[in-house]
Every structure is written in C-alpha cells, then in structure tokens.
Amino acid sequence: MAMNNTSAASACPVADRDDRKSAEFTQKHLSPFAGSKIMRSFSGAREVLRSPNVRQGGSNSSEIVFDNPAHISFFFLDGEPHRKRRASVAAYFTPKAIITRYHPIISRTMAKLTAELQATGAGVLDEMALELASNVTVEILGIDDRNDPRALAKLLHAIRRASPRPNRSALQRFFQDRVFGWYFRAPRARLTKQFYDNHIAPAIEVRRKEPKDDVVSYMIKEGYSKAAMIMECMTYGTAGVSTTREFIGMAAWHMFDRPELKQAFLDADEDGQFAILQEILRLDPVSGVIYRRADSAIPEADDGAIQAGDLVGIDIRAANQDEQTVGACPFAFDAERRTRTRNVANYMTFGDGPHRCPGSQVALHEGRMFLNCVMRVPGVRLAQEPTMLWNPNTQSYEIREMIIHCDKTS
C-alpha cells in the first residue's frame, strides 16, 4: 500500500541523509523547455511515457523532416513505424548478444585498461570509461575504429555540442537558420563531414563486401541515404557512449567516497552488483528531463490534466525519488529498496514505455564489468575529485578529470 509523504518522512530513520552527488548541480543548471508541463511523480511520469497519445518531444524532434520515415532514426519515430523499427534492432540488445558479443569486448578492453593503469600507477577514469563504451558502440554500429575508439566518441560529442539547442524559439530559429545560418551550420557541417568520410564511409565499403549483424549492414540492406546513415549512427553513438561514460563515472565516485559501498559491491554476486548500480542511478540519473508532445488530451493524468498539443517534461530525478513509489528516505542509498518496493529497479532512469532506452542492459553490463575490474586493482583510490560539467543539449551532467591512482607494478 502506498504511503503518503508525511508518514514516509516520519518512517525514515535517517531523514537528513542525502547521498546524491549531482542534485544541487543539476538544480542549478537544469532549464526545462519554456511552456512545458513538468511531471514529477513516478505514477504521472509512467502514465505519460506509456500513453499511446504522446510522441517524442525533445532532442530537436520538432525540426525533423519525416519525408521518408523508413530512413529516420527510430528514436524520433512513434506508433507503428517505431514499433517495427525497434523490432528490427532488438537483436543488438538481447541477453544473448550482450553475453556472446559484448562481454568478450568488455573483458579484453578491461584487461588492457587495468594493465595500463597498473603500469603507470595513474589513470583518468572517465577516459577509461569512454574507451570501453566506445569499443562496445562501434561493435553495435559496425564501424571498425578500435585502434582509436575514443577519437570517434569525442567527434560525436563535438557534433552534438555544435548542434542547435533543443526547443529553440521561433526567433532563435529565424536568426540561427536564416540570418546567420552559415555561421551556425559551418562547425557542425565540418565535423559531420569528417564523421562520414573517416568513419561511416570506410565501414560501408567493408560491410558491402562482408555484411554482419550490425547497424551499418542493416542500413546498407535497407538503402539508407547518406544523411539517414549519419543520423542513425549519431543517435546510436551519442546515446551508447555518452550516457554510459557518465554513469560509470558517477558510480565510481560513489564507491571511492564510501569504502563500505565499494566493498559491498565487490562482495556481491552479479545480481547484487546490478542492484547497487541501479540504486546509484536512481539517486543520480544522468539525464534530467525527457519530453513528450500530447497528440490528444489526457484529462485524468496524475500530475494534472494534459491538453492536446501540450509539451510534457518528465523530471526523471523527481520521479526516481518520489516517496509514494520508492518509499522512505528517498535521498539515501539503499540497495535493498527494489526488493521492498517491488518496482522496476531502474525506475525512470532509462525512461519507460515504447521509447525506453533499448541499450539499458548493455550499459549496465558495461558498468558492472568495468567497476568490478577497476575496484579490484590493488591500491586503487581517487586522487582528484572530478569536475562536473553541464551539457545543455542533452540536459545532463558530465563527469571529467576523475584521476585515480593505484599501486604501480614493478
């Protein structure tokens, strides 16, 4: 039975405890889209995300041209076209694919990274996480860039930062697209050309001769245009690399600051390790707000009536910490919480409904294996507190310069 907020607070034995690391930083920088209706309860968020009466409303979705939906990234599609396209990529994210295709890549990468860490006695954890996430992502894409996987990831990040900010006003679009269009488009165009020429085009040449079960092979088979290929690879690349990198950094930060949590993670079995990571993500989700546009009214929505045409923002952090759902002490770390509440352990961290992140399990496996390796390195410790940055395009935090030290091998 759900408890009200008053009883939940009084039931909390550590009412003043707050284990979140990004809450204050996010509150300072997060700027929901103008005119959006924000859903903060877990039930309200789930209701909207699962509703058939909404469609994608963020990430410049209003500026996407749907001349040929078959060649639009499935991230931007809704309804039956989205279901069909999502089914076509489901094989990349099955438990079998994770274990047989990605686990070997993760294991090889971690052996290399930990050997380098011990050889020098120091490393930058967020850069290590970037390399791992990049290696897995290029396998999914079919882009053979493992000689320098971080270069591709950094290029994708630069393209994303050079992109127009989401939900621009009409005046901003007028000046940025028409009056000074050449100025705003030039950096992105240059970087995008570099991405296609140096990464996608070589992969196309290889996959035409030797197709595999990956994104590039699929796009060749379906006759994607150059622009469509760039968009699809950008979507996979930014989602697969950026979020995983930040999640790993945040989880590591929690463990370095709390030795008992680190030890609990190392002592736990696989399921227990996943529970710890999911609870960290509940407290410090990478993404801030995800958006949906209502095609028709939802008059009985939990957080208030929604009218047709409304832009609705899902406050992931607030939903993840809704006492009605997560129980007492919503800001405190508790790996046993999911057992008591009987809710999906990730809550809203990876979204919900038809657009729930398809690669969430891949990210969790990457994070678990990365941290299980790094935290076992003799003498590993945090040498420098990381810097937190804010990405206005994705409305998410970024963790940088997380320097770690360890016992150096002779």
Predicted regions and their residues:
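Cytochrome P450
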Residues: 2-410
